[in-house]
Amino acid sequence: MTTQTVSGRRYFTKAWLMEQKSLIALLVLIAIVSTLSPNFFTINNLFNILQQTSVNAIMAVGMTLVILTSGIDLSVGSLLALTGAVAASIVGIEVNALVAVAAALALGAAIGAVTGVIVAKGRVQAFIATLVMMLLLRGVTMVYTNGSPVNTGFTENADLFGWFGIGRPLGVPTPVWIMGIVFLAAWYMLHHTRLGRYIYALGGNEAATRLSGINVNKIKIIVYSLCGLLASLAGIIEVARLSSAQPTAGTGYELDAIAAVVLGGTSLAGGKGRIVGTLIGALILGFLNNGLNLLGVSSYYQMIVKAVVILLAVLVDNKKQ
C-alpha cells in the first residue's frame, strides 16, 4: 500500500467524520445521558422529546432555507406568537378549525413575503429587516391580544384543532408526523427541484447567480415566505397543544432555530448545509434540554451549557471553512 493511498484514506476518514460530526455528537449525547439517567431512554420519554422538539425543528427548516441564501430571520418567534393568537381567536369564535389553520398559515406566508420584499427589493440587510419585523410583530401581537392569553375554548371544534398538538395517529404524536413530513418535503425541494438548486447557488455566490439570469429577488421572497409559513405552522402546533395562545409565546425561539441550523452543520455564510443536519441539530437541543431536566440541572446552568455547545459548533464551522 502506497503512502499516497494511506494519506488519501486518512483524508477521506477525516472528511467523513467532519461531515457526520452532528450525528456523532447526538449519539454520544444519548449514550451519556442514558447512562446517567435510567428514565431517559424510554419510549414515552423519546416521544415526549420528539413532540417538544417538533416546534423548534419545523421553525429550523425555514431558518435553514433562509441561512442557505446567506440571510437570517429573527422575526420567526414573534410571527409564531401572532399567527398562533390569530388561529386561537378564530377557533374561539367557533369557526371551523381547518379555516383557522389555513388563515394562520396564509398570514405567516404573507408576512414572510413582506420581509422578503424588504430584504430583496429594499436592499435592507436581513439582520436589520428581520429585527424590525420581530419588534413590530411582537407589538402587533400585544395589541391584538391586549396582552392576555387567547383560549381556544372547549368545543368540539376546539378538540379538532387540538388534534394538531396532542393527537396520536397510529400511536405517534401528530407534531412528530408533521415534523417528519416537513423535513421530507424540504429535503426533496432542496435536492430535486430547480428552486433548491437556486437556493444553494444564491448562497454560494449571489452575483454569479444574478448574472446567470436567475431572479434572485424572487428566490429571496419565496424563501422568507416559506420561513414565515413554517413559523406559523409551529405556532399552530404549540397553541393546539396548550389550548391557548400566549402573547409572549415564541420569545427566544429564533435563537433556538438558528442554533439547530448551526449545530446541523449549515454554514452561516450560506450556500452549504443539509436539511438532515438541521433535524439532527434540533434533536441535539431537544435531547440536551430533556437530559439536563432529568438530571435536575438548573435552568440557569442549562442556558450556559447550550451557549457553550453552540459556540463550539460555530468554531468547528469556521475551522471547516
Swiss-Prot record:
GO biological process, one term: D-ribose transmembrane transport
Entry annotated with the keyword Transmembrane helix: yes
Membrane-traversing stretches: 23-43, 57-77, 126-145, 169-190, 221-240, 295-316
Main location group: membrane
Compartments it resides in: Cell inner membrane
Periplasmic compartment spans: 44-56, 146-168, 241-294
Effect of gene knockout: Disruption confers resistance to cellular contact-dependent growth inhibition (CDI) CdiA of D.dadantii strain 3937, but not to several other tested CdiA toxins.
InterPro entries, sorted: ABC_transp_permease
Ranges of the Cytoplasmic topological domain: 1-22, 78-125, 191-220, 317-321
Gene Ontology terms: cellular component: ATP-binding cassette (ABC) transporter complex; ATP-binding cassette (ABC) transporter complex, substrate-binding subunit-containing; membrane; plasma membrane
Gene Ontology MF terms: D-ribose transmembrane transporter activity
Protein keywords: Cell inner membrane, Cell membrane, Membrane, Sugar transport, Transmembrane, Transmembrane helix, Transport
CDD domains: TM_PBP1_transp_AraH_like
Membrane association type: Multi-pass membrane protein
Top-level taxonomic group: Bacteria
Entry keyword annotation includes Transport: yes
PANTHER family in UniProt: ABC TRANSPORTER PERMEASE PROTEIN YPHD-RELATED, ABC TRANSPORTER PERMEASE PROTEIN YPHD-RELATED-RELATED
Subunit structure: The complex is composed of an ATP-binding protein (RbsA), two transmembrane proteins (RbsC) and a solute-binding protein (RbsB).
Family from the record: Belongs to the binding-protein-dependent transport system permease family. AraH/RbsC subfamily.
Function: Part of the ABC transporter complex RbsABC involved in ribose import. Probably responsible for the translocation of the substrate across the membrane. (Microbial infection) Probably transports the toxic C-terminal region of CdiA from D.dadantii strain 3937 across the inner membrane to the cytoplasm, where CdiA has a toxic effect. Toxin transport is strain-specific, mutations in this gene do not confer resistance to several other tested CdiA toxins.
Protein name: Ribose import permease protein RbsC
Organism whose genome encodes this protein: Escherichia coli (strain K12)
Record gene name: rbsC
